[in-house]
């Protein structure tokens, strides 16, 4: 069998500093292939690897990167003490500016946000780029973690009807943040919401997932389920972006 050439591979890096990176790797592996959406469809194999340093990222040269859940402050500390001399977060800021896709889940969504409510004293290093207000540990402590079904309206391009509705998607919230507000309402698209019933019986709608250009954020953990549809969505976005760059 003829070996796949570079153009027939889509490479996904999963930041493996701390948290649930192995689950993300396994979920991406379960997808196996994706296809271009042009008239003559091309089949793309998916390569996924853990990345722990800037040198790892440069070596893999991924088309997209996933930031896992975990403890955002711990990840920021590990990133700042990276032993190859380059801060991963600084590198990822430039990676995003170059138009590459990135997806943060739970703690990863905090790291991608420009504004964090409830940030620890002295703050923490953030990657930023996502123009929202996010609240750390909005859903409470570990014992307040829960699972529920939500609907997601997954957008592929801005001002375009091309979207996929995922109904009854299993969402796992573990000491989860919540997106309280969208600052840049023109460019940030809401793809998931949830109605929270507070202890006093009142209800509040919070945002659970958003897309801003090449940045995706979800406050829940798709990687802890048996449903790889959100990962399929991200991989397809990465592929579409890659095809635009190489103009297939």
Swiss-Prot record:
Keywords: Glutamine amidotransferase, Hydrolase, Lyase, Pyridoxal phosphate. It comes from Dictyostelium discoideum. CDD domains: GATase1_PB. Pathway: Cofactor biosynthesis; pyridoxal 5'-phosphate biosynthesis. GO terms for molecular function: glutaminase activity; pyridoxal 5'-phosphate synthase (glutamine hydrolysing) activity. NCBIfam families: PLP_synth_Pdx2 (TIGR03800). Its EC number is 4.3.3.6, 3.5.1.2. It catalyses: aldehydo-D-ribose 5-phosphate + D-glyceraldehyde 3-phosphate + L-glutamine = pyridoxal 5'-phosphate + L-glutamate + phosphate + 3 H2O + H(+); L-glutamine + H2O = L-glutamate + NH4(+). It comes from the Eukaryota. It holds the Pfam family SNO. The gene is pdx2. Catalyzes the hydrolysis of glutamine to glutamate and ammonia as part of the biosynthesis of pyridoxal 5'-phosphate. The resulting ammonia molecule is channeled to the active site of pdx1. This is Probable pyridoxal 5'-phosphate synthase subunit pdx2. GO terms for cellular component: cytosol; glutaminase complex; phagocytic vesicle. Belongs to the glutaminase PdxT/SNO family. L-glutamine binds at residues 70-72, 136, 174-175. The active site is at 106 (nucleophile), 221 (charge relay system), 223 (charge relay system). Signal peptide: none annotated. PROSITE patterns: PDXT_SNO_1 (PS01236), PDXT_SNO_2 (PS51130). GO terms for biological process: pyridoxal phosphate biosynthetic process; pyridoxine metabolic process.
